[in-house]
Regions:
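Gram-negative bacterial Sec-dependent N-terminal signal peptides
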Residues: 1-22
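Primary mode marks residue(s) on the alpha4-beta5-alpha5 output face of response regulator receiver
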Residues: 24-51, 55-176, 184-288
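Structural recognition of the beta-strand scaffold that forms the well-ordered cores
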Residues: 54-57, 180, 338, 357, ...
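Short, solvent-exposed beta-strand/turn "edge" segments of beta-rich domains on protein surfaces
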Residues: 167-169, 207-208, 327-331, 345-350
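Beta-strand elements of well-folded, non-transmembrane domains
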Residues: 180-182, 221-225, 343, 359-363, ...
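Flexible, small-residue-rich N-terminal segments that precede or flank a structured functional core
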Residues: 287-343
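A short beta-strand element within beta-rich, extracytoplasmic domains
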Residues: 339, 349-363
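Beta-strand-rich interaction/scaffold domains
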Residues: 363-382
């Protein structure tokens, strides 16, 4: 069996799982709703309570002065992967009867296409993205709506949602697809300046050459107090008219849907997501680690040739033949791998993290099953 490469990862316990090679290049997180503020640290930095009402997910400290550094300095998150302290936010939603409701959670898929031809780059520290149009008045191909009892996502409003399958609530989702081609210069958009755009069949334009994972955010509203919802009459918060410190609220149709993303992934996690997961066509699910290190040395040894060692970077051979005489008649090949051990996160409960060895590779033979065993060993070799 050939394996390529080896990595030692520091993973939150909630991120246990195995890679899938069948769902395409992606990873995901689920983040519960946490708080609502009239803040926007991307477009109205340093101006608390002057933006539209926003519902915040992920980092629990997000406010009008949040930056990548504050997200990492205060990494507490509602997301199910502690490597992700990103801030996600979207405008508050008002029902036709005037009731402002809170979302239940948001699930974000990080996805990509055509990575063989145009591979991904990791999110840079400090990157912020916008998606949607807060002045929108018509369907947007990057904004979709879903009734959980309906026929799937649509870009148009007007569907009337009924009770979902469990018959316990109306569930209404808003999907927001963020741009995935960064200009490589501006970490934040600004009024009159976009810092990212969308690819075309996986390829980024020359003016926005840096391809990053597509952030597909899906916000779920679970509404147990109603039995139907006319989406043409649902509204979203818009920027208020300010009279000194007093707010005059404004509301717009669902076509004003938009969202903000401020990257708060650890740098190791962002790099792992692209380099060792999505660029290899893998579905990492929630197993993107908090930190990781590649093998810094490796060698394989044969029992029939004890004086022969074969260092071969990036490729390790593991072999143990039990057929035709078993171990006494067949060579055994042992691989030794040396790692730098990623440190535990400062200030966080160490019991919430565990170390794992991750491998990527496959069988050389077409038949039979394989088992791989890992044991600690001395590190006085090179």
């Amino acid at each position: 069996m050939k394996l390529n490469p080896f990595a030692l990862t520091l993973a939150p316990l909630l991120a246990a799982g195995a890679f899938s090679a069948h769902a395409g290049p992606q990873a995901h997180v689920v983040c519960a709703y946490h708080h609502t503020l009239g803040d926007d640290a991307i477009m109205m930095f340093g101006k608390p309570n002057q933006a539209m009402w926003h519902d915040f997910f992920g980092n629990t400290h997000t406010d009008a002065v949040s930056t990548y550094q504050t997200l990492r300095d205060q990494p507490e998150t509602t997301c199910d992967n502690k490597a992700d302290s990103s801030a996600y936010w979207a405008p508050s939603l008002r029902l036709p009867d005037g009731t402002v409701v809170k979302p239940a959670y948001q699930k974000t898929y990080y996805q990509a296409s055509n990575v063989d031809a145009w591979p991904l780059h990791p999110f840079p520290a400090g990157l912020s993205l916008l998606a949607g149009d807060h002045h929108g008045s018509a369907p947007n191909p990057h904004i979709t709506f879903l009734c959980a009892n309906g026929k799937g996502y649509t870009t148009k409003t007007g569907e009337v949602c009924g009770l979902r399958k469990a018959n316990d609530a109306v569930q209404f989702n808003i999907g927001i697809q963020f741009p995935n081609c960064w200009d490589g210069v501006n970490l934040k958009p600004a009024h009159g300046l976009i810092n990212a755009t969308y690819d075309v069949k996986g390829q980024c334009p020359s003016t926005f050459p840096v391809k990053i994972p597509t952030v597909n955010m899906n916000i779920a509203y679970v509404l147990p107090t109603i039995s139907s919802l006319d989406t043409s009459k649902v509204q979203l918060s818009m920027d208020p008219i300010m009279h000194g410190d007093e707010r005059e609220e404004r509301w717009g149709s669902l076509y004003t849907a938009h969202a903000d993303f401020m990257n708060g992934w650890t740098e190791d996690a962002a790099r792992f997501m692209t380099d060792l997961c999505m660029n290899r066509g893998l579905d990492c699910g929630t197993t993107v680690p908090y930190g990781y290190s590649r093998a810094k040395a490796n060698v394989w040894l044969s029992s029939l040739e004890p004086d022969l060692s074969q260092p071969e970077p990036q490729v390790l051979l593991v072999q143990d033949n039990w057929q035709n005489g078993g171990r006494t008649k067949n060579s055994e090949t042992l691989s030794l791998v040396k790692f730098h051990i990623p440190p535990l996160p400062a200030g966080q409960d160490p019991s919430q993290f565990t170390y794992r060895v991750r491998i990527y590779g496959g069988k050389v033979e077409t038949n039979g099953a394989d088992q791989i065993f890992f044991y600690p060993a001395s590190n006085d070799w090179d």
